[in-house]
Design a protein with these regions (language model features):
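Hydrophobic helix-and-loop "lid/oligomerization" segment in the mid-to-C-terminal part
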Residues: 1-97, 102-137
Length: 137
């Protein structure tokens, strides 16, 4: 039952996951990672937003990662943002700042702008929390 619910994926879901992982980029000294799937890629693979479930979690479980960001394009310069963290970053605070919500370790929001601008805006908030944690250590 667990395999069917959590692990079983279609071939195209596996393809888009592979692409997201392959094109992911680490930043903030390798403590954070992001990946983006564009609408054209979703169309190419014949997937919809439900097929993207779990990608952000696959990014989060990479060794050394504290915070993962996954974006998928919903329109021109419009992105659905999924945020996950392991132990330090409160992603609900970041999502709330941008009009979204969620929990301490899993949150999301919708943002406008280029991928570069969206990731820069999010990374500034992540960096702030990582700096605070460093100062308190």
């Amino acid at each position: 039952i667990i395999d069917g619910s959590f692990y079983k994926k279609t071939y195209m879901q596996s393809q888009i996951l592979g692409r997201a992982l392959l094109e992911s980029i680490t930043f903030l000294d390798g403590r954070c990672i992001f990946s983006v799937v564009r609408k054209k890629d979703m169309d190419f693979y014949g997937v919809d937003k439900s097929d993207l479930d779990g990608i952000v979690d696959q990014l989060r479980v990479i060794d050394g990662i504290e915070c993962a960001i996954f974006l998928y394009e919903t329109g021109i310069h419009q992105f659905k943002v999924s945020l996950r963290s392991n132990s330090i970053v409160d992603v609900s605070r970041i999502a709330a700042y941008f009009g979204g919500g969620g929990h301490v370790r899993a949150a999301g929001c919708t943002m406008s702008g280029s991928v570069h601008d969206v990731v820069n805006n999010l990374s500034a908030h992540i960096a702030e929390q990582l700096e605070q944690e460093k100062a308190n250590a």
